[in-house]
Amino acid sequence: KEGYPMGRDGCKISCVINNNFCKVECQAKWRQSDGYCYFWGLSCYCTIYQKTPRFGILAPINVEDNVTVTQCLGHLINVMYSH
């Protein structure tokens, strides 16, 4: 599946409209991935693939998002007003 990559602070990686930045961030965390800036969420969003053991082809995997909204709300507000 797809998901949001987390930064060192445990929050989603923030962005405004920079797909290339998000692609680099996603590929740094998961080698075989792609990424873009999800505008409405102001966060990078990744599509991650891994080889399936049966066919040796790439298949999507899930990214867990266990961070609460309140934990990162201040971080999101700072990003919105810093750009």
Curated annotation (Swiss-Prot):
It comes from the Eukaryota. The keyword Secreted applies. GO terms for molecular function: sodium channel inhibitor activity; toxin activity. Pfam families: Toxin_3. Its main location: secreted. Expressed by the venom gland. Keywords: Disulfide bond, Ion channel impairing toxin, Neurotoxin, Secreted, Toxin, Voltage-gated sodium channel impairing toxin. Residues 1-73 form the LCN-type CS-alpha/beta domain. GO terms for cellular component: extracellular region. The keyword Secreted applies. It is found in: Secreted. Disulfide bonds join 11-72, 15-37, 22-44, 26-46. Beta toxins bind voltage-independently at site-4 of sodium channels (Nav) and shift the voltage of activation toward more negative potentials thereby affecting sodium channel activation and promoting spontaneous and repetitive firing. Has the structural arrangement of an alpha-helix connected to antiparallel beta-sheets by disulfide bonds (CS-alpha/beta). Belongs to the long (4 C-C) scorpion toxin superfamily. Sodium channel inhibitor family. Beta subfamily. This is Putative beta-neurotoxin RjAa32. It comes from Rhopalurus junceus. The lineage of its organism: Eukaryota, Metazoa, Ecdysozoa, Arthropoda, Chelicerata.
